[in-house]
């Protein structure tokens, strides 16, 4: 039995776990804390993990920090929902506001690889108009990057991650073929397709970051997806293409160091106002790593928390906060669902949970609300499903037991919908302290009228689709949420944004933010592909800035 990856650091003494070999190790370069590395990266998920690999491959010295453990998927992951909660960020946080956000496994990860270790692998591009949503569609804020530019980085990300997808994707501008063929649909996916066709809207196989055929690469070999169904609880075969299986091995091979179980609590600045390194807790004590540049990539809650916790005499309101926007404009995505029972068995747990998708309402503008949404087939595992029943139907005891007997006959569709930016929705610091003595995040959230209108519309459409295929005992789950964004938005004006298009702080030129917190708008699709595309662009821009002597 493998040791607990949360008990003590695994990436030490010049080696890190080789996740492609049971009990294996891979060489890892180590850097002195007293020597200033080119980049200290806080977080190793879709943003930080990608950036660590691509900067190291350009020859920069990189140390990447993660508060979570360094898991070995072949040994540490179990077919046990409760045990796999170890992958989630469940540290103390304070939530408030009119509509407090549920935090944990649905939107936070605590492991090398970040939340990509337990994400659902849905790999979608933004609708082109969303990059100029204010100018083009009349809501939100414009991105400082055009869709044409992002399309190039999306294509790179899809190739590097080895996305499995349909031969042609029916929405948006034409794009190259996905590297791997689409996954075969399970019964839940086929029923989504049937429901969409019944109400006259399109559907397709979902582009997924999990292999549909064997993959062999310099980092290691991976088999195709075994349709085990535990995607959101850690993939035991390495078929999942996460930061842990794609970017971190590349980072190590290129000379980066990864420090697991290393909680960064403060970014330090010097007399000249530039950052000088990070204070981090590891092996029972606080340490300091000098760095020429610091990249904060802790996602939409931990990124602003770190910037605010790093306040000092020169920056009393926190780092990169000259605009006063650090922590503000927090956005979540709505995750409402429709559930029903089919007479024939569905066995929706077989395979990835979202094998089929419709993006119709992202591209149809005949709506009475701003933004858009997609919906996908679902396949929750038993514990997840019991949570749905207790939450949405208020079932307990014998009523819950009886409802669970229908598990293999259930069908569900779940949306990912865009919620609009609002400065009142924010991350700030609470009075409560965590296990490191640091103020925890306070997450304040309230739904707007547009958010509610979008959810109402989606529930009507999803209900119609499963009613049309004969589902009965239909019920709604209205208030669920998922992915986060905002809180350190990028922009073209330092008065209205935290970082520029390159993810570089306007206020402190050697401080960068590279994760979903830079999103000016959150879109109506899953964010992980966009985060990785942004990281690829940022790495490219850093290389060019360095060559021009402008770092």
Which residues are covered by each model-predicted region?
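Extreme N-terminal leader/targeting segments of oxidoreductases
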Residues: 2-39, 57-58, 544-551
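Conserved redox-cofactor binding core of oxidoreductases
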Residues: 13, 134-264, 483
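N-terminal Rossmann-like FAD-binding beta1-loop-alpha1 element of flavoenzymes
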Residues: 39-64
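Glycine-rich loop(s) and the adjacent beta-strand/alpha-helix scaffold that form part
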Residues: 54-57, 61, 68-73, 77, ...
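Short, solvent-exposed loop/turn and secondary-structure capping segments
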Residues: 73-77, 115, 120-122, 130-134, ...
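Redox-cofactor-proximal catalytic regions of oxidoreductases
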Residues: 83-171, 175, 347-350, 363-364, ...
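A glycine-rich dinucleotide-binding beta-alpha-beta segment and adjacent secondary-structure elements
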Residues: 205-212, 224-231, 238, 265-268, ...
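Mid-to-C-terminal "cap/lid" subdomains and adjacent gly/pro-rich loops that border
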Residues: 257, 292-415, 548-551
């Amino acid at each position: 039995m493998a040791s607990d990856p949360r008990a003590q650091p695994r990436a030490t003494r010049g080696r890190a776990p080789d996740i492609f070999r049971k009990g294996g190790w891979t060489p890892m370069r180590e850097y002195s804390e007293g020597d200033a590395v080119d980049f200290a990266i806080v977080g190793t998920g879709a943003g930080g993990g990608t950036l660590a690999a691509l900067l190291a491959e350009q020859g920069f010295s990189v140390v990447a920090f993660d508060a979570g453990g360094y898991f070995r998927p072949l040994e540490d992951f179990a077919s046990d929902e409760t045990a796999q909660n170890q992958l989630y960020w469940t540290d103390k946080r304070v939530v408030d506001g009119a509509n407090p956000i549920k935090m944990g496994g649905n939107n936070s990860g605590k492991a090398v690889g970040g939340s990509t270790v337990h994400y659902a692998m849905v790999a979608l591009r933004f609708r082109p108009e969303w990059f100029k949503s204010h100018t083009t569609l009349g809501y939100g804020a414009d991105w400082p990057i055009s869709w044409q530019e992002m399309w190039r980085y999306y294509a790179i990300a899809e190739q590097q991650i080895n996305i499995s997808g349909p031969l042609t994707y029916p929405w948006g501008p034409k794009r190259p073929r996905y590297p791997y063929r689409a996954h075969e649909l399970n019964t839940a996916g086929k029923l989504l397709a049937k429901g969409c066709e019944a109400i006259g809207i399109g559907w397709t196989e979902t582009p997924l970051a999990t292999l549909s055929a064997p993959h062999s690469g310099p980092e290691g070999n991976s088999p195709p997806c075994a349709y085990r169904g535990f995607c959101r609880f850690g993939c035991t075969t390495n078929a999942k293409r996460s930061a842990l299986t794609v970017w971190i091995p590349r980072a190590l091979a290129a000379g980066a160091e990864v420090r697991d179980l290393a909680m960064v609590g403060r970014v330090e600045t010097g007399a000249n106002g530039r950052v000088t390194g990070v204070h981090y807790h590891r092996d029972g004590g606080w340490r300091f790593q000098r760095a020429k540049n610091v990249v904060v990539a802790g996602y939409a809650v931990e990124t602003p928390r770190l910037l605010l916790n790093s306040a000092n005499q020169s920056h009393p309101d926190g780092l990169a906060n000259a605009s006063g926007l650090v922590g503000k404009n927090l956005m979540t995505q709505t995750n409402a669902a429709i559930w029903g029972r089919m007479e024939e068995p569905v066995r929706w747990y077989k395979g990835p949970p979202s094998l089929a998708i419709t993006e119709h309402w992202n591209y149809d503008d005949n709506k009475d609300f701003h933004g858009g949404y997609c919906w996908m087939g679902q396949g929750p595992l038993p514990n997840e499903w019991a949570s749905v029943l207790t939450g949405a139907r208020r079932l307990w005891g014998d009523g819950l037991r009886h409802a669970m007997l229908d598990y293999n006959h259930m069908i569900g569709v779940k949306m990912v919908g865009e919620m609009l930016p609002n400065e009142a929705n924010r991350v700030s610091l609470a009075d409560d302290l965590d296990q490191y003595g640091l103020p925890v995040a306070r997450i304040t959230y309230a739904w707007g009228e547009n958010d509610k209108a979008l959810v109402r519309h989606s529930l009507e459409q999803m209900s119609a689709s499963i009613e049309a295929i004969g589902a009965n005992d239909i019920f709604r789950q209205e208030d669920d949420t998922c992915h986060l964004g905002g809180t350190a938005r990028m922009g073209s004006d330092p008065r209205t944004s935290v970082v520029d298009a390159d993810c570089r702080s306007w206020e402190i030129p050697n401080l960068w933010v590279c994760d979903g917190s830079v999103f000016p708008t959150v879109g109506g699709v899953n964010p992980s592909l966009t985060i990785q595309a942004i990281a690829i662009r940022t790495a490219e821009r850093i290389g060019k800035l360095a060559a021009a002597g402008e770092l």
